[in-house]
Amino acid sequence: MTKQRLLFITTGGTIASVRTQQGLKPVLTSEELLAHLPELKELCCPETLALCSIDSTDLGQEHWLMMARAIQENYALYDGFIICHGTDTLAYSAAALSYLIQNADKPIILTGAQQPISNEITDAKKNLRDSVVCAIDPGSRGVMVVFGGHVIAGTRAKKNKTISYDAFASVNFPELALVQGDRLVRYISSPWPTGPVEFSRVLDPKVFLLKLTPGMSPALIPEIFRLYDCVIVESFGVGGIPQQLMDAFAAGLGDYCLLYTSPSPRDS
Protein backbone atom coordinates (compact mmCIF):
# COMPACT_ATOMS: atom_id res chain seq x y z
CA MET A 1 0.00 0.00 0.00
CA THR A 2 1.28 3.46 -0.91
CA LYS A 3 2.10 5.55 2.14
CA GLN A 4 0.27 8.82 2.46
CA ARG A 5 2.13 12.09 2.09
CA LEU A 6 1.70 14.28 5.16
CA LEU A 7 2.90 17.85 5.52
CA PHE A 8 4.02 18.82 9.03
CA ILE A 9 3.62 22.58 9.47
CA THR A 10 5.59 23.89 12.44
CA THR A 11 4.84 27.11 14.30
CA GLY A 12 6.98 26.81 17.44
CA GLY A 13 5.44 26.24 20.86
CA THR A 14 6.56 24.01 23.71
CA ILE A 15 6.81 20.96 21.47
CA ALA A 16 9.69 22.59 19.55
CA SER A 17 11.33 24.26 22.55
CA VAL A 18 14.53 23.74 24.49
CA ARG A 19 15.33 24.95 27.98
CA THR A 20 17.47 28.07 28.27
CA GLN A 21 18.39 30.42 31.12
CA GLN A 22 15.41 32.53 30.06
CA GLY A 23 13.03 29.55 30.09
CA LEU A 24 11.64 27.54 27.20
CA LYS A 25 12.45 28.85 23.72
CA PRO A 26 10.91 27.42 20.52
CA VAL A 27 14.14 27.02 18.53
CA LEU A 28 13.93 23.56 16.92
CA THR A 29 13.56 23.58 13.16
CA SER A 30 10.86 21.46 11.56
CA GLU A 31 13.50 18.94 10.45
CA GLU A 32 14.99 18.77 13.96
CA LEU A 33 11.52 18.21 15.39
CA LEU A 34 10.76 15.21 13.19
CA ALA A 35 14.28 13.84 13.65
CA HIS A 36 13.16 12.78 17.12
CA LEU A 37 10.65 10.40 15.50
CA PRO A 38 12.33 8.63 12.57
CA GLU A 39 9.82 5.78 12.93
CA LEU A 40 7.10 7.99 11.49
CA LYS A 41 8.48 7.07 8.07
CA GLU A 42 7.11 3.58 8.65
CA LEU A 43 3.57 5.02 8.72
CA CYS A 44 3.71 7.85 6.18
CA CYS A 45 5.87 9.97 3.93
CA PRO A 46 6.46 13.04 6.10
CA GLU A 47 7.61 16.40 4.80
CA THR A 48 7.97 19.65 6.69
CA LEU A 49 7.19 23.32 6.32
CA ALA A 50 8.40 25.85 8.90
CA LEU A 51 5.79 28.59 9.10
CA CYS A 52 7.13 30.41 12.16
CA SER A 53 8.86 29.65 15.46
CA ILE A 54 7.14 31.56 18.26
CA ASP A 55 5.46 31.12 21.60
CA SER A 56 1.79 30.50 20.91
CA THR A 57 0.80 33.40 23.16
CA ASP A 58 2.18 35.64 20.39
CA LEU A 59 0.17 33.86 17.71
CA GLY A 60 -2.91 35.56 16.32
CA GLN A 61 -5.09 36.25 13.32
CA GLU A 62 -2.27 36.92 10.87
CA HIS A 63 -0.84 33.50 11.68
CA TRP A 64 -4.22 31.80 11.21
CA LEU A 65 -4.33 33.27 7.72
CA MET A 66 -0.74 32.09 7.13
CA MET A 67 -1.69 28.55 8.15
CA ALA A 68 -4.75 28.53 5.91
CA ARG A 69 -2.75 29.91 3.00
CA ALA A 70 0.02 27.32 3.48
CA ILE A 71 -2.55 24.52 3.43
CA GLN A 72 -4.26 25.99 0.36
CA GLU A 73 -0.98 26.25 -1.55
CA ASN A 74 -0.10 22.64 -0.74
CA TYR A 75 -3.57 21.11 -0.71
CA ALA A 76 -3.23 19.20 -3.98
CA LEU A 77 0.23 17.88 -3.08
CA TYR A 78 -0.49 16.12 0.22
CA ASP A 79 -2.96 13.67 1.70
CA GLY A 80 -3.13 15.44 5.04
CA PHE A 81 -1.68 18.18 7.22
CA ILE A 82 -0.39 18.21 10.80
CA ILE A 83 0.19 21.58 12.45
CA CYS A 84 2.59 21.53 15.41
CA HIS A 85 1.43 24.30 17.72
CA GLY A 86 1.85 25.69 21.21
CA THR A 87 -0.91 24.58 23.56
CA ASP A 88 -1.95 27.96 24.99
CA THR A 89 -3.73 29.15 21.84
CA LEU A 90 -4.07 25.85 19.97
CA ALA A 91 -7.84 25.72 20.46
CA TYR A 92 -8.22 29.24 19.04
CA SER A 93 -6.27 28.30 15.93
CA ALA A 94 -8.27 25.10 15.49
CA ALA A 95 -11.54 27.03 15.65
CA ALA A 96 -10.29 29.71 13.26
CA LEU A 97 -9.08 27.17 10.70
CA SER A 98 -12.40 25.35 10.93
CA TYR A 99 -14.05 28.44 9.48
CA LEU A 100 -11.23 29.54 7.18
CA ILE A 101 -11.17 26.11 5.50
CA GLN A 102 -14.61 24.81 4.57
CA ASN A 103 -15.51 21.40 3.10
CA ALA A 104 -12.03 19.94 3.57
CA ASP A 105 -11.91 16.35 2.34
CA LYS A 106 -8.48 15.82 3.89
CA PRO A 107 -7.41 15.76 7.56
CA ILE A 108 -6.05 18.99 9.03
CA ILE A 109 -4.76 18.17 12.50
CA LEU A 110 -3.42 20.45 15.22
CA THR A 111 -1.29 19.00 17.98
CA GLY A 112 1.37 20.06 20.44
CA ALA A 113 2.84 18.98 23.76
CA GLN A 114 3.02 19.86 27.41
CA GLN A 115 6.73 18.97 27.45
CA PRO A 116 9.38 19.66 24.78
CA ILE A 117 10.14 16.81 22.41
CA SER A 118 13.81 16.97 23.47
CA ASN A 119 12.93 16.09 27.08
CA GLU A 120 13.60 12.57 28.29
CA ILE A 121 10.00 12.40 29.51
CA THR A 122 7.61 14.02 27.05
CA ASP A 123 4.17 13.65 25.54
CA ALA A 124 5.32 15.16 22.25
CA LYS A 125 6.29 11.92 20.54
CA LYS A 126 2.99 10.23 21.37
CA ASN A 127 0.97 13.21 20.22
CA LEU A 128 2.81 13.36 16.90
CA ARG A 129 2.45 9.63 16.32
CA ASP A 130 -1.23 9.74 17.32
CA SER A 131 -1.72 12.58 14.85
CA VAL A 132 -0.25 10.47 12.06
CA VAL A 133 -2.44 7.50 13.00
CA CYS A 134 -5.46 9.77 12.78
CA ALA A 135 -4.33 11.46 9.57
CA ILE A 136 -3.80 8.22 7.62
CA ASP A 137 -7.19 6.82 8.62
CA PRO A 138 -9.45 6.86 5.54
CA GLY A 139 -12.35 8.32 7.53
CA SER A 140 -10.46 11.40 8.75
CA ARG A 141 -11.26 14.77 7.19
CA GLY A 142 -11.62 18.37 8.29
CA VAL A 143 -9.98 20.28 11.14
CA MET A 144 -9.29 18.31 14.32
CA VAL A 145 -7.23 18.49 17.49
CA VAL A 146 -5.30 15.35 18.44
CA PHE A 147 -3.89 15.46 21.95
CA GLY A 148 -3.40 12.90 24.71
CA GLY A 149 -4.96 10.22 22.53
CA HIS A 150 -8.18 12.20 22.08
CA VAL A 151 -9.49 13.37 18.71
CA ILE A 152 -11.63 16.51 19.03
CA ALA A 153 -13.51 18.56 16.44
CA GLY A 154 -11.71 21.81 15.66
CA THR A 155 -14.58 23.99 16.86
CA ARG A 156 -15.00 22.11 20.16
CA ALA A 157 -11.54 21.89 21.70
CA LYS A 158 -10.75 23.69 24.94
CA LYS A 159 -7.58 23.55 26.99
CA ASN A 160 -8.71 22.74 30.51
CA LYS A 161 -5.45 21.55 32.11
CA THR A 162 -2.15 23.42 32.28
CA ILE A 163 0.22 20.58 33.21
CA SER A 164 -1.46 17.21 32.62
CA TYR A 165 -0.89 15.43 29.32
CA ASP A 166 -4.67 15.06 29.05
CA ALA A 167 -4.87 18.80 28.39
CA PHE A 168 -7.82 19.25 26.01
CA ALA A 169 -11.50 18.43 26.27
CA SER A 170 -14.39 18.52 23.83
CA VAL A 171 -17.01 21.10 24.82
CA ASN A 172 -20.70 20.35 24.28
CA PHE A 173 -19.94 17.70 21.67
CA PRO A 174 -18.62 14.13 21.87
CA GLU A 175 -15.03 13.33 21.01
CA LEU A 176 -14.61 12.15 17.43
CA ALA A 177 -12.26 9.27 18.17
CA LEU A 178 -9.60 7.81 20.44
CA VAL A 179 -6.12 6.73 19.37
CA GLN A 180 -5.02 3.43 20.90
CA GLY A 181 -1.54 2.49 19.74
CA ASP A 182 -1.65 2.33 15.96
CA ARG A 183 -5.42 2.01 15.89
CA LEU A 184 -8.07 4.71 15.65
CA VAL A 185 -11.28 3.96 17.53
CA ARG A 186 -13.87 6.19 15.91
CA TYR A 187 -16.96 7.32 17.82
CA ILE A 188 -18.39 9.74 15.25
CA SER A 189 -17.88 9.70 11.50
CA SER A 190 -16.54 12.90 9.99
CA PRO A 191 -19.21 14.41 7.73
CA TRP A 192 -18.65 14.31 3.99
CA PRO A 193 -18.04 17.70 2.37
CA THR A 194 -21.09 19.32 0.81
CA GLY A 195 -19.01 20.83 -1.98
CA PRO A 196 -15.43 21.57 -3.06
CA VAL A 197 -12.96 22.78 -0.47
CA GLU A 198 -13.07 26.55 0.05
CA PHE A 199 -10.43 28.77 1.60
CA SER A 200 -11.08 32.22 3.05
CA ARG A 201 -8.35 34.84 3.19
CA VAL A 202 -10.24 37.43 5.20
CA LEU A 203 -10.73 37.81 8.95
CA ASP A 204 -12.19 40.71 10.92
CA PRO A 205 -9.66 41.38 13.70
CA LYS A 206 -12.08 43.63 15.57
CA VAL A 207 -14.03 40.96 17.46
CA PHE A 208 -14.01 41.20 21.25
CA LEU A 209 -14.92 38.64 23.90
CA LEU A 210 -16.39 40.41 26.94
CA LYS A 211 -16.54 38.26 30.05
CA LEU A 212 -19.00 39.74 32.53
CA THR A 213 -18.03 39.96 36.18
CA PRO A 214 -20.08 41.23 39.13
CA GLY A 215 -19.78 44.99 39.49
CA MET A 216 -18.42 45.63 35.99
CA SER A 217 -18.67 49.32 35.11
CA PRO A 218 -21.08 50.17 32.26
CA ALA A 219 -18.67 52.97 31.30
CA LEU A 220 -16.57 50.33 29.54
CA ILE A 221 -19.26 49.54 26.97
CA PRO A 222 -19.14 52.67 24.75
CA GLU A 223 -15.35 52.37 24.44
CA ILE A 224 -15.59 48.70 23.48
CA PHE A 225 -18.23 49.56 20.89
CA ARG A 226 -15.90 52.23 19.51
CA LEU A 227 -12.92 49.90 19.13
CA TYR A 228 -14.59 46.71 17.89
CA ASP A 229 -16.99 45.65 15.14
CA CYS A 230 -18.54 42.79 17.10
CA VAL A 231 -18.73 41.86 20.77
CA ILE A 232 -19.37 38.37 22.12
CA VAL A 233 -20.78 38.74 25.62
CA GLU A 234 -20.08 35.89 28.01
CA SER A 235 -23.06 36.46 30.27
CA PHE A 236 -24.05 34.93 33.58
CA GLY A 237 -25.81 31.55 33.55
CA VAL A 238 -27.98 31.12 30.46
CA GLY A 239 -27.97 34.80 29.48
CA GLY A 240 -28.23 36.90 32.62
CA ILE A 241 -26.94 40.47 32.27
CA PRO A 242 -27.08 43.19 34.99
CA GLN A 243 -29.59 45.91 34.16
CA GLN A 244 -26.95 48.68 34.11
CA LEU A 245 -24.95 46.81 31.49
CA MET A 246 -28.10 45.97 29.54
CA ASP A 247 -28.96 49.68 29.40
CA ALA A 248 -25.42 50.50 28.20
CA PHE A 249 -25.67 47.84 25.47
CA ALA A 250 -29.05 49.15 24.35
CA ALA A 251 -27.86 52.78 24.27
CA GLY A 252 -25.02 52.11 21.84
CA LEU A 253 -26.29 49.13 19.92
CA GLY A 254 -27.82 50.50 16.71
CA ASP A 255 -26.69 48.20 13.87
CA TYR A 256 -23.89 46.81 16.02
CA CYS A 257 -23.24 43.05 16.11
CA LEU A 258 -23.72 41.77 19.66
CA LEU A 259 -23.73 38.05 20.46
CA TYR A 260 -24.49 36.35 23.76
CA THR A 261 -23.04 33.11 25.08
CA SER A 262 -22.89 31.22 28.36
CA PRO A 263 -19.80 30.72 30.52
CA SER A 264 -20.90 27.16 31.28
CA PRO A 265 -18.78 24.59 29.40
CA ARG A 266 -21.62 22.04 29.56
CA ASP A 267 -25.33 22.13 28.69
CA SER A 268 -25.01 25.49 26.91
What is each model feature region?
Residues 1-73, 247:
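ATP/NTP phosphate-donor binding region
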Residues 9-10, 36-37, 153-238:
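Accessory alpha-helical/coil subdomains and C-terminal extensions
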Residues 9-11, 83-85, 109-112, 144-148, ...:
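Short beta-strand segments
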Residues 78-90, 227-237:
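Short acidic, glycine-rich surface-loop motifs adjacent to enzyme active sites
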Residues 84-106, 241-249:
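Short Gly/Thr/Asp-enriched flexible loops that form oxyanion-binding sites at enzyme active sites
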Residues 105-106, 254-258:
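A short helix->loop->beta-strand "cap" motif at the edges of active sites that frequently abuts
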Residues 110-179:
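Internal gly/pro-rich beta-alpha loop/helix module
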Residues 260-267:
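Conserved small/polar residues in nucleotide/adenosyl-binding loops
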